[in-house]
Amino acid sequence: MQTIRKSLGLVLIMFVLCGFIFPLTVTALGQVLFPEQANGSLVKQDGKVIGSKLIGQQWTEPKYFHGRISAVNYNMNANEVKESGGPASGGSNYGNSNPELKKRVQETIKQEGKKISSDAVTASGSGLDPDITVDNAKQQVKRIAKERNIDASKINHLIDENKQASPMADDYVNVLKLNITLDKL
């Protein structure tokens, strides 16, 4: 009986410690030390939330930089996800031999009309990648300059200003940040 009492006491202590004290401590530390990140790294414009630095959005208008392809169409609306039963995040899981991947790559190449960056035709693992490589961004400059009737050198300068270095991969830019800055030109 004493063993059962000690076991139940330990379960109760661990429940309180792991279920309440630890999560509240981590949440409080996050809010104090990293308030922006702890709240989703939200981007606001005129006091209204327009996106997050960490989650990509679907950009279809030719006057904007387009992000990576998303197998889930950047759908983060919880109600739509619940109704459709579809995932809120996830890659396409298309292998190199999959005809659907080949078809999608060919369609993208046909739209862009030239050799393009690999991240322009492949989805990220989460399907919600907010960044594209600098090469991908530079390949979109001609289209954007034509649509906005502005000099391509201004857009290239904008890309260079927003470039973030990566020690293990290609340099990249955040698509949302780039498009917000583009609208200010």
From Swiss-Prot:
| Domain of life, source organism | Bacteria
* Record-linked InterPro entries: KdpC
Tagged with keyword Chaperone: no
The Swiss-Prot or TrEMBL record annotates one GO molecular function as: P-type potassium transmembrane transporter activity
Q: Where in the cell is it found?
A: Cell membrane; Membrane raft
- Bilayer topology: Single-pass membrane protein
Q: Please provide the record's keywords in A-Z order.
A: ATP-binding, Cell membrane, Ion transport, Membrane, Nucleotide-binding, Potassium, Potassium transport, Transmembrane, Transmembrane helix, Transport
Q: Which residues form a coiled coil?
A: none
Residue ranges of the TM segments: 8-28
* One Pfam family hit: KdpC
> Which Gene Ontology cellular-component terms appear in the entry?
membrane raft; plasma membrane
Reported function = Part of the high-affinity ATP-driven potassium transport (or Kdp) system, which catalyzes the hydrolysis of ATP coupled with the electrogenic transport of potassium into the cytoplasm. This subunit acts as a catalytic chaperone that increases the ATP-binding affinity of the ATP-hydrolyzing subunit KdpB by the formation of a transient KdpB/KdpC/ATP ternary complex.
Which PANTHER family does the protein's record reference?
POTASSIUM-TRANSPORTING ATPASE C CHAIN, POTASSIUM-TRANSPORTING ATPASE KDPC SUBUNIT
How this chain assembles, per its entry, is: The system is composed of three essential subunits: KdpA, KdpB and KdpC.
As for family, the record states: Belongs to the KdpC family.
Q: What is this protein called?
A: Potassium-transporting ATPase KdpC subunit 2
Q: Which organism is it from?
A: Staphylococcus aureus (strain Mu50 / ATCC 700699)
State the organism's lineage. Answer: Bacteria, Bacillati, Bacillota, Bacilli, Bacillales
